[in-house]
């Protein structure tokens, strides 16, 4: 068995619970690393039909002394639902998993969300470990303890805050990631660049202009920096009462677009990319953001190979109605993360219907601002 090669470690401390984010290579095939965080005799691995043939066998071979059960779910956001969740519960109950069991999430953000939610609720909470295999999950979804399933009315409507025992990011898993999935993860990196600004924003701009790939030497450090940014925010505001809400930049638009298309047109990161551009245009319409910065955001998304316009086939009135179901609404006010400049974002609940409608019209394909 290979030994893992450590690139970086980010320590997270939330509400007295501490855990590491380990960025490495060969982490999935080093039994010593995996078993460091599994003290129980029982383990349930939750994965999907895409990831299982690639990595499940490697992970299982490192757990020979455990009762190791497996749930293999269908792949895709449209399967992040009650039916999949109860498939996990059924396996835990049928295989007589006790309160000291551990759940391992092996996959992308969808698997992490569902396995985490199952862990937070099975027998009022059991241990779980994140092994994210997509770039989006590595830089965003696996960090911070948000878990959820979707409801037909909207995305992530049923969920909890529940922190893992560890997040092990094995960079080797990105080698088998389809290019479209890799690009989708870049959207969350651009989000962090807009939130942080300064040298980090400039670095992301530069690597995207050069062409960021799975083989780029800058990638491990960029992943670590994204994890550090999110960890720092989540440590200060675990339950999204203030600062953490900034991490929703672009997501009010993105979630509505995903729900509108029944999660079948875009990957989550692609919807976020469109949402980031919408947020930039909205900020410009409110007189907050200079047009050259909006153009920079557009260029970053184009360099990343991501969509940024709303297709003209989308009914904007229906899209606006879906936004009214957004779970980030407070006091009946729809809240948006606004951008004054990279590194200066804030929550705004005073966006008028006219301003929002004008923004949506101007980000439709073929329309000019």
Curated annotation (Swiss-Prot):
Known catalysed reaction(s)?
A: 7-phospho-2-dehydro-3-deoxy-D-arabino-heptonate = 3-dehydroquinate + phosphate
As recorded in UniProt, coiled-coil segments are none
GO molecular function terms attached to this record:
3-dehydroquinate synthase activity; metal ion binding; nucleotide binding
Output the Gene3D superfamilies linked to this UniProt entry.
3.40.50.1970, Dehydroquinate synthase-like - alpha domain
Mind naming one GO cellular-component term on file for this protein?
cytoplasm
Residues annotated as binding NAD(+): 75-80, 109-113, 133-134, 146, 155, 173-176
Write one Pfam family the protein is assigned to.
DHQS_C
| Cofactor requirement | Co(2+); Zn(2+); NAD(+)
CDD domains per UniProt:
DHQS (cd08195)
Q: Which GO BP terms apply?
A: amino acid biosynthetic process; aromatic amino acid family biosynthetic process; chorismate biosynthetic process
Question: What the protein does?
Answer: Catalyzes the conversion of 3-deoxy-D-arabino-heptulosonate 7-phosphate (DAHP) to dehydroquinate (DHQ).
What family does this belong to? Belongs to the sugar phosphate cyclases superfamily. Dehydroquinate synthase family.
UniProt name for this protein: 3-dehydroquinate synthase
Q: Which organism is it from?
A: Legionella pneumophila (strain Corby)
Q: What is the lineage of its organism?
A: Bacteria, Pseudomonadati, Pseudomonadota, Gammaproteobacteria, Legionellales
